Amino acid sequence: NDMRYRSNFGFIHTSGNLFLCRKYLGASGIYGEKIPLIRLAEMYYILAESVALSECGQYINAVKNARGISRAYDVGTDVTEEQRLEELNKEYQKEFFAEGQYFYFLKRHNMKTFYRCPVENFSAYVLPVPDDEKTYGEAE
């Protein structure tokens, strides 16, 4: 019953090799032209990452319940750090589909891969330090 699956997921094939993400289709006015800088769900997830393990469930559950997920799937108060990251990992994938935020979550937690990852490790995403930064900056 997760409302994110009904509206966000999937791509629409238009012509040739062009695919459009359904998440952003159909919005009109300013909502069709802008993507929010930060969303309430992201703030809740940041809180869930930073508070004590016994408190993280209330923030994750607030988002899950607002998305129509049954309270039977709520995160309890007796979670481990691994369980917290696993739950946040699942929620980031659903909440920030096609936005790029999930990539930063993976980098922040030094997670190397995800299901069907097209790149073996994230070293492919590390850009070299610019020469000016080596010459004039503090980089080595």
Model-derived regions, located:
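Acidic/polar-rich alpha-helix caps and helix-coil junctions
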Residues: 1-140
